[in-house]
């Protein structure tokens, strides 16, 4: 069972380009990179050469005579004589390149020759990407893949583009959803929250129709991520990174979700842990959301690098990291308890990141003024508040009405309720979060 992904359309466009460059697909482990590449390859190429540098490390020898296309193909033929290497017919796929980043140097020569399409893929690439970038600059194209977003989950459940179009139309016209729509889409979104977006987890749920086999898969994924930390880091750094990674659920369960290093180790200093935090971010395991120095445009350069929140890149990791009682309560009773705010906030951060939006929040010193996220349109800054209930939005009103915040004219509130608008505060259900970038783009037109 293949689950349709957004990378499918990108690969179609890449193949149709007359000036296509070798492609590097990066992203966290188990988000479906290899499956999507091979699904595309089987329907577009008569022959595929697939090399996995983890499963077959012997292929690291293919560069022993240099980086030219001729030498690489000759060495591949020596190691794999049955390989069909036919110009303009064979797709070359090099997987797990984090184990062999030197292969990226060959992309220049493959591009200049133009005989073969080449796709490279790997996880943990942030750790080696400066090296990969310097070795292939100007001769490759990049695509960053994430786990499934809510739209892809809806595709997996059998819905098509017409649903997305209808949802966006409701948002643009501020037309409330019917009760049937609210119940159905809300239930789907809650299922997605509990599952996360890892394809193998979603596939199991789609095939079985229940959650009974989901938790073991989520826990294994969490263990795999921790194993990567142990694999790629020496002892002391490994301990720091694991300590931070394991502290995220407790950090998010706090009323103030700002990352506090003292929750990781008593008496610890943030400066000693920043490399470990950046490692997790580069490895694609977490999203960092920086506090704005002041809520104004431009956003770039306006973030305080010493004040931030850490979210799991995929909310399924947050679910898997909770204690067993909390997990059972979540699935059996849909009781979000103390983690209600954490779950929804992590999910919205994930949705914004997957839509290509940067993550920023704001907390005014010595004040109750605080906003969860910000989105910029062409000419304005729009604060975004995630409400666990459907309560008041005092901070939103203050930001909109106070002339000191001149870039802010309206705000958005995400709630469990329906669509509405009052005092320039636009209210949308949580399940609309994946459409916010498209909605904001429409406001600017």
Which sequence ranges carry the predicted segments?
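N-terminal pre-Walker A segment at the start of P-loop NTPase domains
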Residues: 1-16
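Conserved lysine of the Walker
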Residues: 33
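Hydrophobic positions on the alpha1 helix immediately C-terminal to the Walker A/P-loop
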Residues: 36, 40
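Short glycine-rich substrate-engagement loop in P-loop NTPases that contacts/grips substrate
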Residues: 55-88
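Structural recognition of the conserved hydrophobic beta-strand(s) that form the central parallel beta-sheet
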Residues: 93, 117-123, 144
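Interdomain motor-coupling "hinge/lid" segment immediately C-terminal to the ATP-binding subdomain
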Residues: 130-253
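Accessory nucleic acid-recognition modules appended to NTPase machines
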Residues: 203-370, 374-378
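Catalytic cores of nucleic-acid endonucleases
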Residues: 388-428
């Amino acid at each position: 069972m293949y689950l349709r992904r957004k990378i499918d359309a990108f690969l179609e466009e890449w193949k149709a380009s007359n000036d296509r460059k070798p492609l590097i697909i990066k992203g966290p482990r188990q988000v479906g990179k290899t499956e999507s590449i091979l699904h595309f390859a089987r329907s577009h190429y008569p022959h595929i050469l697939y090399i996995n540098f983890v499963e077959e490390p012997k292929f690291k020898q293919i560069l022993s005579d240099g980086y030219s296309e001729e030498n690489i193909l000759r060495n591949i033929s020596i190691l794999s004589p049955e390989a069909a290497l036919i110009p303009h017919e064979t797709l070359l796929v090099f997987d797990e390149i984090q184990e062999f980043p030197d292969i990226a140097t060959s992309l220049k020569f493959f591009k200049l020759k133009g005989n073969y399409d080449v796709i490279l893929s790997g996880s943990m690439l942030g750790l080696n990407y400066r090296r990969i970038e310097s070795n292939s600059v100007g001769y490759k194209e990049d695509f960053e893949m994430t786990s499934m977003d809510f739209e892809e989950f809806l595709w997996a459940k059998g819905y098509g583009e017409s649903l997305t179009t209808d949802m966006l139309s409701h948002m643009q016209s501020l037309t409330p959803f019917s009760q049937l729509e609210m119940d159905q889409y809300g239930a789907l979104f809650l299922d997605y929250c509990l599952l996360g977006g890892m394809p193998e987890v979603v596939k199991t749920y789609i095939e079985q129709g229940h959650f009974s086999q989901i938790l073991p898969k989520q826990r294994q994924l969490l263990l795999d991520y921790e194993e990567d930390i142990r694999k790629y880091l020496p002892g002391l750094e490994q301990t720091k990174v694991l300590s931070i990674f394991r502290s995220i659920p407790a950090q998010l369960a706090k009323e103030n979700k700002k990352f506090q290093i003292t929750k990781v180790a008593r008496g610890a200093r943030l400066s000693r842990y920043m490399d470990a935090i950046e490692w997790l971010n580069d490895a694609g395991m977490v999203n960092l959301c920086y506090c704005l120095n002041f809520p104004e445009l431009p956003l770039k350069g306006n973030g305080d690098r010493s004040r931030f929140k850490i979210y799991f890149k995929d909310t399924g990791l947050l679910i898997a990291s909770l204690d067993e009682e909390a997990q059972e309560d979540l699935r059996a009773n849909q009781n979000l308890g103390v983690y209600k705010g954490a779950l929804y906030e992590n999910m919205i951060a994930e949705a914004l990141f997957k839509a290509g939006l940067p993550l920023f929040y704001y907390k005014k010193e010595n004040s109750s003024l605080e906003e969860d996220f910000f989105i910029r349109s062409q000419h304005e800054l729009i604060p975004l508040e995630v409400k666990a209930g459907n309560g008041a939005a005092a901070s939103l009103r203050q930001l909109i009405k106070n002339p000191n915040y001149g870039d802010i004219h309206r705000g958005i509130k995400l709630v469990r309720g329906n669509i509405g608008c009052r005092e320039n505060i636009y209210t949308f259900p949580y399940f609309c979060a994946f459409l916010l970038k498209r909605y904001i783009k429409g406001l600017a037109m």
